[in-house]
């Protein structure tokens, strides 16, 4: 006898993005990508934002561009968050359940995070020692469980689920120093639980970070960026310089991939797929950190010698304006955080290891590696900055912004890039001078 599920699976199209469906997931027919995205979003209690009008197109090629609209459509189409296991492990609670209908009000509560906060507060009051969080992918979206210490707990720290997870992804058992609270925003809700005692860095974290630091090319960029005083740079000259600079930065990312400690763990096909999708993001991250002195110094001096025409100013697009504003925001965020080299290399690895990218064959392996460096970054920030409990979430929340900017850059006409970088670098250099 045919079932409702059999009839729907025959359609073979994901109800969220239209990609090839693999079955009934959390109540509706969907693909593996949307299934995993929904699970991570709910398990990690993520709150997204849409930069447009909350009706972005959802397709196989565009689904990663707006996490807000993707999750919104998951809920609107009937994905059942209660079908997800609380521990975040594979295997839903009820595979035969169909789609659920929830009110617009409840959807809004979920999208705003209000529902998660209320559930977390209830769980905290009922059982303050329970581990309610499960780490997800750091890279396509922000990964934000909230590790803090609970001095008042009478139970052993080893009862907390983080111990086994930490050992699983770092590979080396270590002493427990903290526990998870239910959601990211618990930091401000429970200020008395923030750890103040110093602790040591996990030896495995130290090793993995050093491997990433070794893979990074910190030599100054070789692209000439010095212009004699009084020389007027033309649009075509500046564009050519930006192209040469992008070529060198891209070459360095290709070399970086070959030096990664997990290079032998993935296929060349997967590396090609990951790099071809994330190279702009990697260049942006490295420009904000490793090569920031040259980018915001030498290159900014070159762009200052370029004077756009009235026509160029008039034709500057809305996409270009949005990218410029977001780049300035991201620059100020990195400057405010003073991102260390150790944090940068972890963020770069997390961003690169994005299992949601279409075409990857070893999805689970990429996700495992992603989680490993997610924990390494968390371990390091809590060790190095014990009095900055929001630092790790702040770092992780920069990654979706990096992705969004990189995605928007492709929509900016090439002839507008000289003006975009002139305006961006001028604003950043001005803010540095004021500091």
Curated annotation (Swiss-Prot):
Q: List the record's Gene Ontology CC terms alphabetically.
A: cytoplasm; nucleus
UniProt keyword Nucleus present: yes
**Cross-referenced PROSITE patterns:** NR_LBD (PS51843), NUCLEAR_REC_DBD_1 (PS00031), NUCLEAR_REC_DBD_2 (PS51030)
Q: Domain NR LBD, which positions?
A: 204-435
Family matches, as InterPro entries = NHR-like_dom_sf, Nucl_hrmn_rcpt_lig-bd, Nuclear_hormone_rcpt_NR3, Nuclear_hrmn_rcpt, Znf_hrmn_rcpt, Znf_NHR/GATA
Zinc fingers (NR C4-type) by residue: 14-34, 50-69
Q: Where in the cell is it found?
A: Cytoplasm; Nucleus
Bias class Polar residues marks the residues at 121-141
Q: What is its main location?
A: cytoplasm
> From the UniProt record, which GO molecular function terms apply?
DNA-binding transcription factor activity; protein homodimerization activity; sequence-specific DNA binding; zinc ion binding
Q: Which residues bind DNA?
A: 11-86
Assigned keywords, A-Z: Cytoplasm, Developmental protein, Differentiation, DNA-binding, Metal-binding, Neurogenesis, Nucleus, Receptor, Transcription, Transcription regulation, Zinc, Zinc-finger
One Pfam family this sequence matches:
Hormone_recep
Q: Record's Gene3D superfamilies?
A: Erythroid Transcription Factor GATA-1, subunit A, Retinoid X Receptor
The record's region (Disordered) falls at 84-157
CDD domains membership: NR_DBD_GCNF_like, NR_LBD_DHR4_like
GO BP term, pick one: midbrain-hindbrain boundary development
Q: Give residue spans, biased composition: Low complexity.
A: 142-156
Q: Outline what the protein does.
A: Probable orphan nuclear receptor. Binds to a response element containing repeats of the motif 5'-AGGTCA-3'. Required for anterior-posterior patterning during organogenesis. Acts with chordin to play a role in patterning the midbrain-hindbrain. Isoform Em is required for integrin-mediated cell matrix interaction during neurulation and for the morphogenetic movements leading to formation of the neural tube. Also mediates the effect of retinoic acid on primary neurogenesis.
What protein family does this chain belong to? Belongs to the nuclear hormone receptor family. NR6 subfamily.
Q: How does it assemble?
A: Homodimer.
- The name under which this protein is listed is Nuclear receptor subfamily 6 group A member 1
Originating species: Xenopus tropicalis
